[in-house]
Amino acid sequence: CRRADIITYHVNANDSTKGMINKDAIAKMKDGVRIVNCARGSLMIEADIKAALDSGKVAGLALDVYTNEPAKESVFFGMPNVVATPHIAASTAEAQINVARQAAEQVSDYLLKGVKTNARNGDKI
């Protein structure tokens, strides 16, 4: 990440990813980096990112996820170097159609072939 102009985060929220966008990670980034987080708000230490935005270490931030959702307030709202949108990245018509199709295919695969795909509780089925 020392050479990247833009770093995007697309990971699950869990104990190992909580707070992964923090002052230590930012210190390893290129000066003027731009960060995109459309994964989960819990990845961010907001105070660390805000300080980096204020100092110019981070040139810009784009996000649609927040520590507290729905976000009525955020330290990032109103900052000129931040693009903040509601958490709607997966709410397009196309995304919803794809999710419905995938769910139907996975149910069909299980019923017809006994194949379990993406089952979090597969051992209980």
Where are the regions that the model predicts?
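Rossmann-like dinucleotide-binding domain for NAD(H)/NADP(H)
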Residues: 31-125
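Rossmann-like NAD(P)-binding element
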Residues: 1-20, 28-37
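Charged helix-capping and loop-helix junction motifs
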Residues: 20-24, 103
